[in-house]
């Protein structure tokens, strides 16, 4: 199985080492493509890293009128191609996880591409290489999962919409679901280990993110 990322919210301590490291990635122009969010700011100080989930059927690419967002042979959803990007920001508004951000300085959508410049050379993404607690891991499914006491989940349910992702969330083994909203913060919607995608996410209304959609 191909290498991918595993996100374990229970291990995140909010140190933001991942954010600092992401800025150092040579293709990111000094911007971080990863965010650290509060799971439920009103009730806890628990945090979790938010990366691009690299959807199997990425809505950001589906809504792009210029075909500027590509998916490579390994299933990594890439940032928009500058010659094609129209500045329409459809991708920013359509992502159910609230990941893509619009860079107004260079007029381009930018997001996590799983450090393609590093992983293509056999290196871990910057965030996974510096995370002190293992909240962000990178490797093959059969290598990572047996070492954890948590359950990998990559099928997300937003109402009656199912979104399958390349990136896995690691959940407690006795939990069948975790609540998330449409912006990548764990509040208000359901994530389960369901297997089948059903309807197109584009049929759903996307909620406004409480994070800034621009750099």
Model-derived features with residue positions:
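Non-ligating segments of multi-cofactor redox enzymes
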Residues: 1-215
């Amino acid at each position: 199985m191909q290498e991918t990322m595993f996100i374990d919210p229970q291990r995140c301590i909010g140190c933001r080492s991942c954010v600092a490291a992401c800025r150092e990635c040579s293709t990111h122009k000094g911007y971080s493509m990863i965010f650290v969010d509060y799971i439920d700011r009103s009730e806890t100080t628990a945090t979790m890293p938010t990366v691009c989930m690299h959807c199997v059927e990425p809505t950001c690419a589906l809504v792009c009128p210029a075909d500027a967002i590509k998916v490579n042979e390994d299933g990594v959803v890439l940032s928009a191609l500058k010659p094609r990007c129209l500045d329409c920001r459809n991708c920013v508004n359509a992502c159910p996880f609230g990941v893509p951000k619009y860079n107004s300085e260079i007029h381009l959508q930018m997001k996590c591409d799983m450090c393609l410049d590093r992983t293509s050379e056999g290196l871990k993404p910057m965030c996974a290489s510096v995370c002190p607690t293992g909240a962000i891991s990178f490797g093959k499914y059969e290598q990572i999962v047996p070492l954890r006491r948590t359950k990998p989940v990559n099928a997300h349910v937003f109402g009656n919409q199912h979104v399958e992702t390349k990136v896995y969330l690691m959940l407690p083994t006795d939990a069948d679901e975790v609540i998330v909203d449409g912006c990548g913060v764990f509040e208000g919607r359901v994530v389960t280990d369901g297997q089948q995608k059903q309807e197109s996410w584009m049929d759903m209304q996307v909620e406004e993110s409480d994070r800034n959609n621009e750099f």
